[in-house]
Amino acid sequence: MRNLLRKLVSGVLAVSLAASLLPAAAFAAGNSAKETHITILGTSDMHANPWGFNYEDDKETTNNGMARLYTYIQQVRAEEPNVVLLDAGDDIQGTIMTDDIYNKKPESPHPVITAMNLMGYDAMTLGNHEFNWGISTMKKILGQANFPVLAANIKDASGNYVTGAGWTILERSGVKIAVIGVDTPDVPIWDGGKEGIEDCTYEAASTAVKQAIKEIGGQADLIVVSAHMGLYPEFDEEHGADSAQKILDDNPEVDVLQVAHTHSTVNQKQGNVVIGGVRSSGREIARFDLTLNANKKVIASSVEIVDMNGVTPSEELRSNPVIAEAHQATRAFISGGSGEDGEKGASLGSTTAKFQPKNEIDRLPEGKLRDTAVMDLINKVQLENSGADVSAAALFKDTSDLPK
């Protein structure tokens, strides 16, 4: 009888304990169910590299290109329900494909914008290189985009955003995400005098972001700034008009900051703000992960910079007719000369040695350390084309060379 009583008491206690735990478990499960996970993917400075190819050497690359980025983007979309894809500018300039062919015929389907449309971008921020061919050409090319192009700090002579938008609001699972785009206000330093450039006004980035946040008001749960500039000033040391750090200092409402322009990896957190930036030509992608609670407040956030080295390029992107044709046209332009008939031009000569010697110090090009044939060539071309008496140049691309 005593054993039976002990069993009955034990059973009652077990049932009572289980019952007491049920509400807590249900509460925890309910809270978890109300959390929302947002993944923001950020690219920038892709510099007209949809394929992942070095046209000067006629060789495939192994670690960059929009086709590799797209493979990774598709993987993330298959794993995460709420993905936002942003770009921070400098995309339509940078290779022979654009600079020598497609940007000279802006009414034609543009391979970079075609690729970005295929990849499903949600928004893009203007970069300074988008202005290289003047305002009219820029608008014709970017007008092909199926997504908004943002520049909250650049307005035309009529006081309108030069691209038609300074910010946009996206929605994922009920979470409203405001994306504010700002470009470096230093554009006139590089492109002043080109068509329409000096008709625009270029405002300090932090000031424009503050105004955009005021306009957005309570419409958004998250504030994302996509800035085509580095963290620290490039020219305006005193006021920080071209500093992304100044944006954060003046606008505590910002949750995510994407930086660009400097072609360098940035991966850090300041307080609760996640900050990311990537290297150029599609070498890396920034991944921001945020978790929001039932009140749509950020309770966890992180940033990761993902390298594209070894990633398989997307055949879907490469097989797109516009992109495939542009790739072949660029190779033909190099190998067949620039004549419309596609025939090779006259031989200008032959190289007897590399124009830039092998680096004596790893990652420090000889063209930046001493007199080299590659720098002599650049200066002679500048003298010939400008009619100047003196030419000074610095090596822009560390690997610039003419092989033996």
Segments (PLM) and residue ranges:
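Bacterial Sec-dependent N-terminal signal peptides
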Residues: 1-12
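C-terminal segment of classical bacterial N-terminal signal peptides
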Residues: 18-27
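Non-catalytic terminal accessory segments
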Residues: 27-35, 61-66, 77-80, 218, ...
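Acidic, metal/ion-coordinating pockets
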Residues: 28-312, 369, 374-381
